[in-house]
Every structure is written in structure tokens, then in C-alpha cells.
Amino acid sequence: MIAARLHAVGDLRVAAEPDPGDVPDGWSLLAVTSVGICGSDLHWFSDGGIGENRIEHPVVPGHEFAAVAVTGPYAGRRVAVDPAIPCGHCEVCRLGYHNLCPTVQFAGHGTLDGALQEYLVWPDHLLHPLPDELSDDAGALLEPLGVAIHAVGVSHLRSGSHVLVVGAGPIGVLVLQVARRCGAGRVFVVEPLEHRRATALRSGADAVWSPEHGAEAVLDATDGRGVDAVIEAAGTDAAIATSVAASRPGGRIALCGIPSGDTSCFPAALARRKGLTFAMVRRMNDTYPRALALAADGVDLDLLVTERHPIIDAAKAFGAAAERRGDKVVVEVSSGSGGAAATPEPPQR
């Protein structure tokens, strides 16, 4: 089979690799169809890791993906795949925080190979059948939609709350759409790139601004009050500063963006005077059923896909994503037919 493996910073190599071996009980062999490139993938590609986690050996990236099940209970069906494998039995998992499991394995991060390969095996309970009306790309993007759902939950958004989204990359735009469906009052967006501001407007933002005057514009639009909730999806200190300045006293800021380094700074005096609450967003937590329901309800996932590349051009795809010249870059691994799929032939071993 063909796989794309990250060897070092900027060194993504596509090569033939052995097909998967025996499939354990409770797992399925999958033929990968579509893989979205996430901002966290770019941290591994451009920075060599995230926080204290670094590339220790060559790894196959990719955690936003859809596939066709070759074996197992969903054989012949297209599936979206939850990329996180928590242990399920530690105290954190028993409390329901599967996304915070200290020993979680996550596709394409650390030691577990991800989806930029033609075949892989995955636990059956993490597979979610796709309805015919959702494309393979949409199936892959259920993962970032799940992150957006989790981020909105962490923000404690209530019906009628005014919301600011800082950063209109794919996560930010999905946060915007989820906030709308959760009954938000007005939803504002601050984003530096013009084409992403345009995407935010098409996705239902009440107003969008560039960062230079973003906080001031939010305060003007709310008669000096500020917003009830901020979801920060940019990962920069400037974005956090905008979040603090635009928040109302007693407001809540959900930090979803991942910084390039391992530290973030914010205006402490202003945040203290406002009595702001900061909450960290860690991936998602059992959100696939809700993501599927929201996609069926009209959250537009295909809108975000602005560029596609075959797996043989995976390095080119990562370069395009790093340049941020569009919204979402997708790697096409194989065809799942976009609807009901026939069972692919198992790879020859």
C-alpha cells in the first residue's frame, strides 16, 4: 500500500509500505478515502511537534478521516472514524473525560500512525456509519465539527448569548455554525485573512473584522458591553488579547487554538478586573453522534473544502495548508464513491 510518513520537520515522504497484518478481534480493516489536514497536523509538519511532544520516529499523520470498512460489523459501508483511543478504565475516563485520558492514543500524533495510508485497522466502537447524503470529505470533517461542538460546550454558551469567534479557520467557521444552532444571539468573527472573513460571512456571521480593530469593533457593536462568550481558535497571544478586550465583565473565554510554542500570554490586569474565566479545549469528547446530527441539520462541511490532492502529492497538500491560501485542504486516498460503497477487496498480504 501507499503511505505518507513524516520523518522530520517538513520531511513528508510518500512510499510503498507493507499492508496491515492480522486484524484483532473487535477491530476492522479500513480503506481510507478522505483525510483533512488539521492545524495540529501542521504543527507536527512545521514545528516538529506540539508542546513537549516531538517527532521521535517517522509517523503517518492524519486524524480527520473517512473510510470504507473492508471487514467487521460495517463491512461495505462508509464510516467516519473517531481518531482517539482512550484507555476507558482510568479515573479520568470513568469520570467521562475520555478526551483527557492520560494514556490516550491519537491517530497521527506521537506513536500511533494516522490515516494518510491506504489501509489501517481501527476499533469497531469508534466507527460511525455515514449516511448517503454526506460526502467522504464531510465524513472526514466530522472530526473538526466535533471539536467545534466541544468548544461551544466549554464556552457555556446560552441561548441569546453574544459570541465572538477569534480565528476563522475551519474550526472557527464550524464553531460559528454550531453557535448559531445553539441559539446564540449575535455572532461576531475576528480574522486576519480576507478569504476566511468571506467564508465566515457566508457561514452566518453577523459581522467580521480584521484583528487591528477587532476588539474595538466588538465593543462598539455591543454598546460597550462586550460579548458573553469567546471561542479563541487562532492560537496566538494577540488572539487571546483580543478575546480579553472584547469580553464583558464575568465573561468566559474558551481557548481552542494551539500555540506554536508551549506558552501563551494574556493581559492579566484587564482579565482580572473583568473577572474572566478561561477554559481549555482539548480535542473533543464523544461528539460524533451530535456531529452527525448537526451535519444532517445543515451544518455545511463541504463548504470548507477548497483544495484537494491525491495521496501521492501529500507533501504538496501540506505545503498548501501551511500557506493558508484556502480553508480546508483534503487528501484523497481512495474513492468511497460518495454514497453507499461496495466492499473493497482486502489488500494482498
Where are these regions (language model features)?
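Glycine-rich beta-strand-centered segment in the early N-terminal region that forms part
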Residues: 20-35, 50-91, 131-133
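Mid-domain Rossmann-like dinucleotide-binding core that forms the NAD(H)/NADP(H) cofactor-binding site
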Residues: 76, 134-213
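NAD(P)H dinucleotide-binding glycine-rich loop of Rossmann-like/cofactor-binding domains
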Residues: 87-166
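Residues in the short beta-alpha loop(s) of Rossmann-like NAD(P)-binding domains
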Residues: 192-193, 259, 284
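C-terminal hydrophobic helical "lid"/dimerization subdomain
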Residues: 1-3, 241-244, 285-349
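Glycine-rich cofactor phosphate-binding loops and adjacent beta1-alpha1 units
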Residues: 155, 198, 203-277
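N-terminal glycine-rich cofactor-binding segment
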Residues: 5-22, 39-66, 80, 101-113
